[in-house]
Swiss-Prot record:
It comes from Listeria monocytogenes serotype 4b (strain F2365). CDD domains: DHOD_e_trans. Binds 1 [2Fe-2S] cluster per subunit. Binds 1 FAD per subunit. GO terms for molecular function: 2 iron, 2 sulfur cluster binding; electron transfer activity; flavin adenine dinucleotide binding; metal ion binding; oxidoreductase activity. Belongs to the PyrK family. This is Dihydroorotate dehydrogenase B (NAD(+)), electron transfer subunit. The keyword Calcium does not apply. It comes from the Bacteria. SUPFAM superfamilies: Ferredoxin reductase-like, C-terminal NADP-linked domain, Riboflavin synthase domain-like. Its cofactor is [2Fe-2S] cluster; FAD. GO terms for biological process: 'de novo' UMP biosynthetic process. Responsible for channeling the electrons from the oxidation of dihydroorotate from the FMN redox center in the PyrD type B subunit to the ultimate electron acceptor NAD(+). Keywords: 2Fe-2S, Electron transport, FAD, Flavoprotein, Iron, Iron-sulfur, Metal-binding, Pyrimidine biosynthesis, Transport. Coiled coil: none annotated.
Length: 254
């Protein structure tokens, strides 16, 4: 973990209120799929950092890409960043995805919902690099909210579900995955809690890893703002920022 400043290379709105932010900095060397950064807004009245998942990184170029959606004052502040600006960053943080499994999987299903889609990109890229057959299933409210279909196509097959039917299959991600003829060797998923619950219920016998989306304050396990009950004892809790955000599906109670 490192508190540092990163420089903005580029920022682009790639979907409705969704921005692609390209940063450069030394902390890229320590990044792994599924981790996140805590970004500090520039406004003095916004005291709390905001957690943003890492979409991708290039350790040789020392660059990373963050995708985020404007949800409030903090992310609106980030959307005003432009080339050459700097931003105060804490990270990379959290426990990411386990991609070095034994035995190695031959097929992997990556399921993302909304702003839970971004971490699936680097994960899919690295799995494909290991020879794993990757299938992406991305869920959005509407076509105007969708992003990164072309980029993900470089590393696997991409399926899209939209609630209003304006792109891909009308419905939810499980309306696609429940019709697959065979189950994958491993599943990775990130998105809203209701989606993760549905994924967990649909594949009870498949090795599944879930990246939880929780509101965070500190990002380092000190404040207990982002806890999740343990599956084997609801009185005990995981700290999502420190113990996660990635957990085995059988570890957590959603």
């Amino acid at each position: 973990m490192l508190q540092t400043e990163m420089k903005v290379i580029q920022q682009t709105e790639i979907a409705d209120k969704v921005y692609e932010l390209i940063l450069t900095g030394e902390c890229v060397a320590d990044m792994s799929p599924g981790q996140f950064l805590m970004l500090k807004p520039s406004r003095s009245d916004l005291l709390m950092r905001r957690p943003i998942s890492i979409c991708s990184y290039d350790k040789t170029a020392k660059t990373c890409i963050l995708l985020y959606r404007i949800e409030g004052d903090g992310t609106r502040d980030f959307s005003k960043l432009s080339e050459g600006d700097t931003i105060d960053v804490l990270g990379p943080l959290g426990k990411g995805f386990d991609i070095d499994q034994t035995p190695a999987p031959k097929t992997a299903l990556l399921i993302g919902g909304g702003i839970g889609v971004p971490p699936m990109y680097q994960l899919g890229k690295e799995l494909a690099g290991k020879g794993v057959q990757v299938t992406f299933v991305n869920g959005f409210q509407s076509a105007k909210d969708s992003f990164y279909e072309k980029e993900m196509n470089a590393y696997g097959t991409v399926h899209i579900a939209t609630v209003d039917g304006s792109l891909g299959t009308q419905g939810f991600v499980t309306d696609i995955t429940n019709n697959f003829p065979e189950e994958p060797d491993v599943i990775y998923s990130c998105g809203p809690k209701a989606m993760l619950q549905a994924v967990k219920a649909s594949f009870p016998e498949t090795k599944t890893y879930l990246s939880l989306e929780e509101r965070m304050a500190c990002g380092i396990g000190a404040c207990y703002a982002c806890v999740c009950p343990k599956a084997d004892d609801a009185k005990k809790q995981f700290k999502v920022c420190e113990d996660g955000p990635v957990f085995r599906a059988d570890e957590v109670s959603l």
